[in-house]
């Protein structure tokens, strides 16, 4: 599978995971919507100076593939508003605790995201990767930042990350070149692997959010 195939499986799964999250914590439907409305109406900065946008807020969904996934995001939303009683308010300021938690949960490891989609680039490609996650996201309007209930996104790399996150900005020129390239080295030899005589076993989660088990 290539990166596009992977995301065409995982974006629908993320919509399903978001639905499960809201079913477990119905109060967070309103909270997440209120946070997104605030982020769309005015500029909000994280403690490190990075802008907190709706797209970055949606990336909290990366937790949905682990434990305690739903609980961790619920705890973050529980402290979102300065009034402190957990109620949603588009007129309230977002709390320092919330902003710090979102920053920690969505801050990128600098070498992880630049390589993320290229693990699927095994040798010469017929077409460039060209920001696979962003392209597939465009096929799913339900992930737009102004859609309610707000859908969260999973483990996916988007071009805005290399503009908004200071740790990733130095990689942007290289990413712009690589995303249009089709010439990559061979990561693995499929023919040699097919001839392997050493018994191997692998396990995968049935409903893995990151790489669909059907692939």
Please place each PLM-identified region on the residue numbering.
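A short, acidic, amphipathic alpha-helical segment used as a generic capping/interface helix at domain edges
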Residues: 181-192
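A structural signal for short secondary-structure junctions
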Residues: 192-197, 211-212
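Conserved catalytic-core segments centered on acid/base and nucleophilic motifs
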Residues: 1, 200-201, 209-210
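Short, flexible loop/turn elements at secondary-structure junctions
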Residues: 65, 204-206
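Conserved alpha/beta-hydrolase "acid-adjacent" motif
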Residues: 69-72, 209-214
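Short beta-strand/loop motif that positions the catalytic acidic residue
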Residues: 196, 201-204
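A catalytic-pocket lid/entrance helix-loop region that shapes and gates access to the active site
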Residues: 2-40
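Alpha/beta-hydrolase fold active-site neighborhood
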Residues: 43-181
């Amino acid at each position: 599978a290539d990166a596009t195939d992977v995301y065409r499986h995982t974006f629908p799964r993320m919509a399903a995971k978001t639905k499960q999250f809201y079913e477990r914590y119905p109060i967070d439907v309103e909270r997440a919507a209120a946070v997104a409305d605030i982020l769309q109406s005015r500029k909000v900065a994280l403690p490190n100076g990075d802008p907190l946008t709706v797209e970055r807020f949606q990336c909290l969904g990366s937790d949905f593939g682990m434990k305690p996934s739903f609980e961790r995001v619920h705890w973050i939303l529980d402290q979102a508003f300065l009034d402190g009683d957990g109620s949603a308010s588009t007129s309230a300021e977002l709390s320092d605790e919330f902003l710090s938690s979102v920053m920690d949960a969505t801050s990128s490891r600098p070498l992880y995201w630049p390589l993320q989609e290229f693990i699927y680039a095994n040798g010469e490609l017929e077409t460039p990767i060209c920001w696979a996650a962003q392209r597939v996201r465009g096929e799913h309007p339900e992930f737009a930042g102004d859609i309610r209930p707000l859908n969260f996104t999973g483990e996916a790399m988007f071009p805005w990350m290399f503009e908004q996150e200071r740790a990733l900005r130095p990689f942007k020129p290289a990413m712009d070149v690589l995303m249009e390239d089709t010439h990559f080295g061979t990561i693995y030899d499929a023919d040699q692997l097919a001839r392997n005589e050493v018994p191997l076993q692998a396990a995968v989660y049935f409903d893995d959010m990151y790489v669909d088990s059907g692939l």
